[in-house]
Design a protein with these regions (language model features):
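N-terminal Rossmann-like dinucleotide-binding module
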Residues: 1-49
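Beta-loop-alpha module in the N-terminal Rossmann-like domain of NAD(P)-dependent dehydrogenases
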Residues: 53-108
Length: 108
């Protein structure tokens, strides 16, 4: 028997609902979610989707990489680059849901 991949998601907005539903239908175990600091929505989101662990700091979720195998970043555009930079350093698969920047100069 093969184990299911553990997926974490950063973001708890409307589009994140679709990502979690699709991930579960595709056989992932969604094990954690993080959103902005002090966000009540992350707790409600986790309860709604039966996600066992929450983080109030997305960078902390990334740092605790032993808890997950792959990551979806569904955060606001301005938040993506710092999160993606940290996630890439770990070397695990990352799906970025939104544009990573609003200008090409922001990518450099």
């Amino acid at each position: 028997m093969t184990s299911r991949l553990r997926l974490a998601i950063i973001g708890s907005g409307e589009i994140a609902n679709f990502h979690v539903s699709a991930a579960k239908r595709s056989g992932f175990d969604v094990v954690g979610v993080a959103a902005r600091k002090n966000s009540e929505t992350v707790r409600v989101f986790a309860q709604t989707h039966e996600i066992p662990q929450t983080w109030s700091d997305p960078l902390q979720l990334i740092a605790e990489e032993d808890h997950w195998d792959a990551l979806i970043i569904a955060a606001s555009t301005e938040a993506v680059i710092p999160l993606l930079t940290q996630a890439i350093k770990i070397g695990k698969p990352v799906l970025v849901e939104k544009p990573i920047a609003t200008t090409s100069s922001a990518l450099i």
